Amino acid sequence: MRKYISILAMACLMAACSTTSGVPDGDQLYTGVDKISYENYEPNQHADQMKEEMEISLAAEPNGALFGSSSLRFPFPPNLLIWNAYHDKEGGFAKWMTSSFGKEPVLMSRVNPELRTTVAQSVLRSHGYFNGQVSHSIVQSHNPKKARISYLVNMGHLWTLDSIAYVGFPLGCDTLIQQSLPLANIHKGDPFDVTTLSSERNRISNLLRSNGYYYFQPSYSYYLADTLAVPGKAQLRFQMVDDIPEQARHRWYIGKVNVEFRKRIMDRIDTVTNYRRLSIGFSGKRPPIRPRVVLSNLRLRPNRLYNYENHLESIEKVNAMGIYSMVDFQFTPRDTTATCDTLDLKLNCVFDKPYDFYIETRATGSSVGRMGPELVVGLSKRNAFRGGEKFDIAFHGSYAWQLNGGHNNYYEYGFETSVEFPRLIAPFMGGNRDRIRRDGTRRRRRFFTTPTTLARISNNVINRPGYFNMNTITGEWTYKWQRTPTSRFQFSPIILQYQFKNRVSDKFTRLQDSLLYVSYMMEDKLVPQMRFTYTYTSPSSYRNPIAWETTISEAGNLISAGMLAFGKKWNEKNKNLYKIPYAQFLKLETDFTKTWHVGDYSTLVTHLNLGLMYTYGNNFSDTAPFSEYFYVGGATSLRGWSARNIGPADFDPDWLDNRTLRYLRMGTIKGVINLEYRPRLFGNLYGAVFLDAGNVWMHHNLLHNLLVNIEDAVSDAEAAVVPESPDTPEIEIDPEAERSVINFLGSLDRGKFSFRRLGNDLAVNTGIGLRYDLGFIMLRLDWGLGLHVPYETGKSGYFNASPFGRDQTIHFAVGLPF
C-alpha cells in the first residue's frame, strides 16, 4: 500500500510543473465563475425562484471544484495534473494513471459561455422578463492560458397577466372549466410565467380526463397572448385546438375489466374465473391472489365514467402492494364506430420473485463502555397469504465485552417475525371497502397512500454469565394510514412486552437484595401499552414549512379499569395479571420544527421537543419501565454533551462516579429547544451555527423512592465484599459506587421540576457544524460547546460551563438533527 501511495505522490510532484500544459493553443483553462451580477432586481418569491434557475443554467464546475462549486476550486487539482503528465504517453502505467486518476482539463470552449448566456436569457423570458438581457465577459488571469467568466443579468420589467379567458371549448368541457376556476393556477396580476401556464394547461387536461374525456391531452389546447393592448401586461386566451380527434370530444365509460396474472412475462393463461364483474386470468388451479383483494385495489369499475384520478389511484394501489415486477393498464375501445363510448380495460400483472434473503452486520456500543458485533439473518416472502401480505422472519445474535477489561461481557440472541398487510384489518374498519350512505350510495374511503396493518412478535434473550438469563417477549399490532399529503397517522391498540428471567445466580440474587434500583429494573414485568402518533408536514410548496409530531401512549389503565369489577382499587399497588406485575402510566411527547428560508440557499430552523410522563396506580414506588423515561444530550438534542450526561435538573455528575449508573440520569418531564442557522458555504457544503437549551426533570421524588433504604444497601454491599465462607461466591460490588448513589440521593429534591428554578435548570450550549449534501443522504459533523450547566462548577456567573473542557462533544451523524 505504501508503495502505491509513494508512486502517486511522485507522479503528482512530477506533474506539478503546470496545470495548463494540456490546454491546446487558442483555448483557455476554465477556472470557474467569477461572479453573477444582477441589475433591476426586485426581491420577491418569483424573482428568487428565477434567480435560482438562472444560476443553475450558468453553473459549470472547473477542475478541482470544491463540493460541486462553480466558483471555488483547489488551485492545483491532482486529477488535472496527472492527466497533463500522462495522457499523451505510451505504456500501460501511463494509461492506467490517466484512466484511474486523471481528468482532462475543462476548457473555455467546452464551457461555451455564449451558449450559456443564450440559455440564461431564455430562462428570463420564460419567467416573464421579456426585456431582460444576459451578457458575459472573460476575466483574464495573470496566466494567459487561464480565465474565469463573469455574467451580468439585467432583468428588466416583469410582465404580468391583465386578463384570462377560456374560449373555444365544447359546452360540456366549458361547464367543467368554469366550475373549477376557483382552483385555477393562474390569476389576473400573476407573472407571465411559462411554468405556471403549463401547470394550468395540465390542470385543465386532468380535469377533463377525470370526467370521462379519456383521450384529451394537454397538447389539444394552447394560449394566445396579446402584449400590445396594455403596456407591460398580457391579455391571455386559453382555447382548444380546432382539429382535435373526435374521440377526444366526448366522454368514455369503462366496459369489461380483465385482469391477467403471470409469474413470468411469457406464461400462458389457461384458467379464467369471474368475480362479480371482474374477469381474472391465471395459470394453475387457483388465482395467485384473492379476487376480493384485486377488486379492492381497482377504482375503475364497469359501467362507470372513466376517471383519471381513479386511474392513477388504481396504479398506485396495485404497485404499492410490492408483489409485482410489472403492472400495465391497457384501455381499448370496444369497437371502431364513431358512436363508441366504451373502453375495455385489461390489467397485466407479472409477479416479482417471492423470496428475499438478507444478511446484516452491525457494530453496537453503549454508554457504559460495552462494544461488540451483531449479525442479523432474515427471510422475506411476498404475497404470503394471497392477499399482498409481506411475511418477514429474522434471527439475530450479538456479543458485547467490557472495554475496560472487566468481567461484564454478555451475549444476546433472538428472533422477530412480522406480517404487513396492505390494508386496514379491524372490525370497525371493514377493510378497504366502500361505506354505504343512508341514501344507498357508496362513500369512498380515500387514502393518499396505501394503509397498512402490521403484526409483529419478537423474543430477545440476554445471557449474562454468572448473573442471569432474561427473556423479553414483545407483541405489536399497528395501523398506519395517510389521508392527505400532509397528515399521517399511526395507531397501536396493543403493544405488549413481557420481561422475565429464566435463570438467576446466587451472586445476582445478593446483588438484587443489596440494590433496590437493580431489583426494580430487572424484575419480571408486563407492559401492556397503547400508542397513537400524529404527524403533520407542510405542503412542499411552502417556503417556510413546519413539521409537527405528537405521540400519546398509555399502559395498564384498561387492565386496572377492568380490575375494578373484581374489587381491586385503582391506586392499589402491586396488582398482577396472571401473577405478573404490570406497569401503569400516561405519556405525552410532542416535537415541532419551523424552517425559514433566509436568502436563496440559507435556512433558519427552530425546534421544540416537550415530553411529560405521569406514573401512578400499580407501579412500584411510582416508577415506570426504564426505557420509557426521557433523557437529553446527544447528536439530536443538547449537542454540548453526550447522551444521558445532563439532568435531572441540577444534578451534579461528580455525585455519581460510576458510569454504569448513567441510566439514572433521566426524567419524567423533558424540555428541549434548538435554534440553528444553516448557510450554504459553497457547492453542496453547508455550515451550521446552533444554540441548544433543555433538561429533564422529575415530577416527584421518583429515584428517592426507588433507592430508599440506600444506607442499609451500602452496608450490605460492603459486608458482601468479604466472603462469608470459602463456598460463598464473592459479589462484585464497588462500595465507592454505592457512596456515589448516596450523594446522588441528597440531590434528588432539586431534581424535581420547579418553575422558580427553570431558568437555571436549563443547560445551554452553542456550537458549529458542517453538512454535506450527497443528494440521497446528508452527512453531518457538529461540535457542541457548553455555556451553562445547572449545577455548581466553582465558576461565578451564568456562563459556568467548561466549553473547552468536559462540556464539549463532537458528533458525527447521518441526516439533519431536526
Where are the predicted features?
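Internal, charge-rich low-complexity segments
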Residues: 44-51, 58-59, 63-79, 260-269, ...
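Gram-negative/organellar outer-membrane beta-barrel architecture
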Residues: 176, 287, 307-549, 639-640, ...
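Conserved C-terminal beta-signal and adjacent last beta-strands/turns
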Residues: 672-679, 687, 693, 762-774, ...
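C-terminal outer-membrane beta-barrel translocator/porin domains of Gram-negative envelope proteins
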Residues: 284, 364-368, 490-684, 689-755
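C-terminal motif of bacterial Sec signal peptides marking the signal peptidase cleavage site
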Residues: 13-16
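Sec-dependent signal peptide recognition
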Residues: 2-8
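Interaction-mediating elements
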Residues: 18-320, 329, 342
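Flexible glycine-/small-residue-rich
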Residues: 19, 153-157, 168, 238-242, ...
